[in-house]
Every structure is written in structure tokens, then in C-alpha cells.
């Protein structure tokens, strides 16, 4: 049996799924693992990868998660957070189908809206604001300048001449 070296990111031949010995191959496997398991920490993810013969450092894993756009979300009940990767797997604005995905996320995560001046304020369950703000940014809505997210609150800046209240109404319509 041939064994590849762990520092090259390979997997034992005949053990588990075939893994490319590249960053892209490792990241692809990370996406699959996050989809299949409720991963609560980077060390848990590293253990899952190690079980498949993919050794990685915490710094590399952190960089991979960042490049994949992975975020840690908590359920509405405030339970332990789990890592999720955006469906499109891409941190790029204006992804095809962005508004379809945004509508689904708004339906799942939008708790309430408010407005002031040219800003719409969106409330989400704890831990979900960054994820929803990222989806808003990726959707590249023409009437949104940008977003700022905290833990459970998003400030969405309306493009003039739209007001914050009008923007909040448009976002609610998407939900």
C-alpha cells in the first residue's frame, strides 16, 4: 500500500474518499465535511480531516475557512454554533442566483426590520448577522450600498434616493 506524506495533504490510498493533494482538494473536502457534519470547532474539523489522512495546521485551516467564506452560526435558540459554507462557495459579489439564495436566507433568518434615515436595520438570531450580511452583499442589489454586521444586527445602507424605510420594505418583500 502506498502512503502519501501528511505534510503534503495526501490521504492513504484505499482509505476514505480520494483527496487531491492540493489546497483546492483540501478545501473541497472541507466543504463536504461541513455539509455532512455539525462541526463546532476548528479542532473538530482538523480531527475529521486527520481521520482521512489529511494533516493540516490550525493556521492553514483558519485560512481555508476564511477563503471558503465559512461562518459559525448559532441556532435561533442560542445553541452551540456550527460552521457553514455559503451554498455558492464563493465570496464574490453578484453571484448568479444570489437573490434566490438571499430570499431563502431572509425567510430563515430575518427576525425584524427598522429604519432611520438611509439605513435599514435588520435583526437576526444571535450569530447570524454576518452570514446574512454576506448574502446581501453577494446579491449585489442595486439599491444597497453596503452592509455592516454585528452579532444579531445588520445596518444596510440604502443608495440614494431610497430611504431606510423603503429599503427595509424591499428587503421584507424578498423574504
UniProtKB/Swiss-Prot annotation:
Pfam family, one: Arg_repressor_C
UniProt-annotated stretches for the region Disordered: 1-23
Intracellular or extracellular location(s): Cytoplasm
Keywords: Amino-acid biosynthesis, Arginine biosynthesis, Cytoplasm, DNA-binding, Repressor, Transcription, Transcription regulation
Principal location: cytoplasm
Pathway this chain belongs to: Amino-acid biosynthesis; L-arginine biosynthesis [regulation]
Cellular component GO terms held in the UniProt record: cytoplasm
Top-rank taxon: Bacteria
GO MF, any single term: DNA-binding transcription factor activity
GO BP annotation list: L-arginine biosynthetic process; protein complex oligomerization; regulation of arginine biosynthetic process
InterPro entries in UniProt: Arg_repress, Arg_repress_C, Arg_repress_C_sf, Arg_repress_DNA-bd, WH-like_DNA-bd_sf, WH_DNA-bd_sf
Family listed: Belongs to the ArgR family.
NCBIfam families noted in UniProt: argR_whole, PRK03341.1
Biological role stated in the UniProt entry: Regulates arginine biosynthesis genes.
Classification via HAMAP family: Arg_repressor (MF_00173)
Protein name: Arginine repressor
Organism: Nocardia farcinica (strain IFM 10152)
Gene designation per UniProt: argR
